[in-house]
Amino acid sequence: MGVGYGFFQYFQVVNILSMKCYVVLIPVLLCCCCPILSSAQDPSDPYMADVTTQTFAPTAYSIDSSAAAVILFDVGAVSFNPNANNGHQFSYILEKHIRIRLLNKSAFNLATFTLSAYRKGPASPTIDNFKGETYNLEDGKVVTIRLDKSNIFKDQSGDLSMERVVFPNVKEGSVIEYSFRVTYPGFQYIPTWTFQGSYPELWSEYDITVPTLYDYAVRHQGYQKYVVDSVIYSDAMFPINFGNFSGTWTGRTIRRIWALKDVPALEKMEPYTTTLRNHISKIDFQLKAVHANGYDRTYRTTWNELTDELLKRDNFGASLGDRNRWLDDDLKTITMGAGSPRQRLQKIFTYVRDHFDCNNVEGLYMSQSLKKVWEDKKGNVADINLLLTAICRHEGLDASPVILSTRQHGYAVDDYPLLGDYNYVITRVQLGDSAWLLDASKPYIGFGQLPELCYNGWARAIDSSFAQIPLFPDSMTETRLTTVELNNTDSGYTGTYNRDNGIFESMTIRNRLRKETVDDFFESLRKTMADYKQMDQYGFDSLNVPEADLGWHYRMKYNFRNGTIYFNPIFHERFNANPFNAPVRHYPVEMPFCINNIYVLNMDIPRGYRVDQLPQSQRVKLEDSSGIFEYLISADDSVIHFRTQLTIRKTNYPLDEYQEIRDFFSLIVAKEKEPIVLKKIKP
C-alpha cells in the first residue's frame, strides 16, 4: 500500500502485466489540451474525517468480513520545490497520511514498522514531520495516545540508517494513524504508488503536481477502475538551473489525482499464477525528457543506450570484449576433437554446465571476475552464463548475453527498457542461420534448452542487434506419452508401464534425482498403487543425457483375489483434484506451457473375469477449442482398449474465461475417477 512496497523507497520499477498496463506521458502530451479534462474532486473527505465513536462501530467491513485489518484511507500527495539548496537543486516532496483499523491481533504487525531505511548521502531522501496516534474506544469515549520520541527507535547497520516505529496501547479494534513527509532530491524520481496491499483499502489516493517542463512516462497496472482520474492546470513561475541555462521558467503545472475505492486485499498466490507483482494495482513513473526555455534533454533510455551501458559495466559486459588469455591452454583440451562450430559449442556448454556449481542466485550482474569464476568453478547465474559467453567468444563463436525477466520476477515491458524489469542472463550463439539459447547454470538442462522460468515474454540480446527474442510460454508444448500393456501370461497377470516425459518434466525429475535415489523415486510410486499390484524391473531411460526426454518404466504383476475389481485404467497421470477448485479467482490463469498428454492402455480381460461396467467414451472442448479432452474406451470379449488425451493450446486465460476452464477440469477430474468394473465369472 502507498509508496513502493514499503513506506519509503526510491522510485523503483516493478514488473508490469502487459495485458493490464498502459503507459501515458505527462505532462507534454497532456499540455496539448489546455482545457481542464475534469475537475479535481475531494471524495476522500468522508474517509478523512476525525476519528469518532462511529469509527469504531463496525466489527467487520463488507469489503472483506474476515479481514484482520482494514485501511480506512491511504493518501499520498507529491509536490515540487524548485528552490532547494538555494535554487540549485530541484526536489519532490511526498506527504503521506494513512489510517488503519486493527480488528484482530493477527494484524498487530501493522503497528510496528520501519519508518525509513536508507544510506546517508546527498541523494538520500530526508524524512520529517512524522506524527502518529493510537485511538481506542473506552467507556464510550475516544481516547487518543499520541506518539512521541519514546516510540521511535533508531538503529544503525553500517551506513544504513533505520527508524522503527512502535505504536503504543494497541488492542483489537484500535485505530492507528500516522503521517509524514519525505523529500526526494532531484527531479528524476516520482515515488511509485501502490493502491493495493495485504489488507483491503476503503480509499487509496495519489495526488501529484509537477511542472510541465518535465515529461514523465506513467505506467498504470491493475484491474480496478479509478473512481477519480482528474487533471488540473495552473500557471507557474520559478527559477531553474539546467546545464548552462539559469533563469526564470514561466509555464504551467499539471496536477493529477488518481483514486481507488474499496480495493480488495492482494490475494494469496493461486494455482497457475506467475507472481503477484504482475497483478498489484499501482502507478510508477519514469522521467523521459526536460524542456525548459530552449534547454532540451532526453532521459528515456533506448535499447541502444541500455546495451551500451551494460557492455561497459565491469560486472556485466566489459570483460566480454577481452581476449581472456587465461583460457587459452584449458580450452584446447575442452574443445579437442570438435569437428564443427556446433560440436565446439556443445563441448564448451557441456563443460561449463558439468564443472561449475551455481548458487541459483538470479540477477543481471556478476558477483566476481570471470577469471575468479573460472578458477573457483562456482558463482551465480550471471557469473556462469557470462563466462559461457566469454568462452564462446574466445573460441571465435558469435556469442552474446541475453537478458530476460523470469516468471517469478514478473513481466517486462519491452518497448520501455528499464534494467529493473530484468533479472536473468542466458547466452545466445549464432551458428549460420540458427540461434542457440543456452543456460549452463543448472546441471539438468540440456544443450539448446531453457528452464521453464525463462518463458515469460520478450528477452533482449545485449549486442549491436538489440534483437527481441520471443520466449513466450505459448511457444512451448510439453508432450507426455504413456503406454500400458496388461496381459494374461503363464506366470499370471502381468504388464509393462512406459512413460516418455516432455522437456520440463524431464528437468524436474532429473533435478529431483540429485537429492534422492532411483529406488526412492519408484518406492514413492509404489505406495500409490493398489494393494493387489506389485512393481519390479523399474528404471529410467536417458537419465544421464540431459538433452534427451527422460523416460521411465517398470514391470508389474497383479494378484486378483476379490470377486469384484474396481480398476482405474489411469495409473499415475490422472487429476486427483481440480487445480482450479476455487469458486472465485482473482488473477488470470497463467500456465507455464501448453500441454499434450496422451495415455494409452491395452489390457487383456483377466482370466476368470468379465466386464461388468465400462465408462462411457466422451469428448469435450473449450469454446475456443484451446482445450480438448478425449476419453475413448472400448471392449470385446477378451481385450479392453483405452486412450485419453488432454490438449491445452494456450497458456493465458483471462478472468472472464475462468469459470469455463474450471468446469472443464472438473469434468476431467470426475471422468478420470470412473473405474472399469470387472466381476468374477461364476463357475
Q: How should these model regions be labeled?
A:
Residues 1-45:
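Bacterial Sec-dependent N-terminal signal peptides
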Residues 4, 411-415, 624-625:
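Short secondary-structure transition/capping segments
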Residues 41-300, 370, 383-389, 393, ...:
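Beta-strand-rich, non-transmembrane domain signature
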Residues 106, 184, 335, 352-356, ...:
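Sec/Tat-exported extracytoplasmic proteins
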Residues 303-376:
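Secondary-structure boundary elements
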Residues 332-336, 481-483, 586-591, 611:
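Extended, non-catalytic structural segments that build the interaction scaffolds
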Residues 522-683:
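A carboxyl-terminal module marker
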